[in-house]
């Protein structure tokens, strides 16, 4: 019998997977071509960076083990992997690059053999500060109003169109400028099942003026209804900026503000059809971050030089760069992309297959959203059976363990443990070796 040996690690799990770059000394200039994470690391050393530590520290800890690990086991062969947890931050270059790549690949696999249209909906500049303080409220209303505007005229003709709405919050130079891109294939489905194609911009059931009026009308109606809503929960409370508190406190002032917004122009830009290659459109709206590592030119004398969305060079102090980047943080677990109409999640596969059959085109291969197959047996699916949290605490997923067809014997011991130090030495070393594979 193997004795139970208490393993006293200077146990900080993250040490196993510390990133392979050195911290920069205070007086050392950042390398000419730094990453966004390296710029953040440099800034967070600043004693005045306190407001941003919580937001960006988890980005720096992403994939290092400091956020813990998850244990995955193949439900067919029992292959085991222990993978550092990702941060899932809306501002993490690693997480969002991977999310965007997977989303773009899947959407390209679903493209229909018809022209595609891009429509951009923008909020008035006068709503920018209010939006900054109320992202979840405004973005929810924004999605609802854009979808209502897109559906109104086709709905009147008993036609169901399909479209994707993608929220982007940035303009050039990292300024906060929330707007929505709508990607729509030029085809609709009538209630009798027949297809209705839109080969040109003129053939569409709406134009920019129709879309703008409906967008403005629905948005302001929803915003006003939210203002007068009773018994709202924490996420629904309107946060008024200091310069707008009088509007929030006085009903007459609020109605006057709504009236002023009604008089303003609400921009809608309806583009020409994309005949040749809608892949570029999908790639563009699939972007998740306001800036990528590729846009960073360098850092010198405390300033970041980067290329903006218009391919112009911009120079900002590191502090201003981080502050502008922080403005694009999304509410927790907020989804920036939504599908509507015949492209909604419950209808998409059937609709795409049906349209392709009608048009005589091969059916696209629709990939799984998250690749989770076993790389060893090529047959099983990797299931998360547990978490190893900071400090070695263990949390088990009983449901997935029961789904395993080939269950490793060590799982029974793992189920009884509260912490890695509760495990017998052989199993502890086995798990630590699996963690070390991602060093």
PLM feature segments, named:
Residues 1-439:
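Beta->alpha loop/short-helix hinge microenvironment recognizer with preference
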